[in-house]
Amino acid sequence: SDTSTSGCWEITTNKTTFRAKTIILASGGCSYPGTGSDGQLFSVLQRDLDLEMIPLQPALTSIRVQNYPYAKLAGISFKDCRIRVLRAQKKIAEEKGGLLFTHKDFSGPAILNISNFAQPGDTLVIDYLIAPRDEIAARLQKSAEKSHSGLPAILSDTFHLPKRFSQLLVSRTVNSTKALAAALTGEEFQITSLSGFEKAMTTAGGIALSQIDLKTMELKNHSGIFVCGEMIDIDGSTGGYNLQFAYSSGCTAAKSAIRLL
């Protein structure tokens, strides 16, 4: 609460009351609730300060699909895949990068980045190899004609794919090079859900940018209160960008708060 007579803000808990001329809100989002960052402060701020809030949702999280086939291959990863999300047969987003099989879902950098655009009911398309389908089929056929090995071995040797993945993929497709090429360059899954805040690397949504002076990180309508990090409606791709924003916005908020003391 604002105490105009003393020029200070008051924060009242169930045990005591704190008074301060400046406050920095840095309680994080809803991700990793085990650390204490469970998002409860958002409802308090909305109630007491009448702040506009963008709905909170998990960001940079794994994607769960119907009939996920790779539970037994958990831990297997691919360095360069192409991931697409389709909605009503139209491409919503595309990412290139690493893919990881887990016990329950798809993960890895490309999946995490594209999860921000995905919704249940969308189609997830995975290209394990980024090359024209006809080219993949031709290479497979040529290798098969020269080798007496089975298709799993041919697949692994030709494209340097994990052997266990090759074995499972062959068992899930018609025993033909064309069918394998189709699976390698566009295997489709229906998205059932995104993993929740427990597995999300960051939180999307939060205090609307319109409420904040981004030069100082001070709330426009509440002098002396500053915000930083995941509390703000800003989220980025994997690669340290969210951490850097937390550090930079926190530093800006601290320097701005000091000037008022």
Predicted segments, located by residue:
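Short hydrophobic core segments
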Residues: 17-33, 45-46, 99-102, 225-227, ...
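Conserved mid-domain beta->alpha element of the FAD-binding
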Residues: 116-120, 151, 176, 224-225, ...
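A conserved FAD-binding loop/helix module that cradles the flavin
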Residues: 29-44, 234-261
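An anion/pyrophosphate-binding glycine-rich loop and adjacent beta-alpha core
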Residues: 50-175
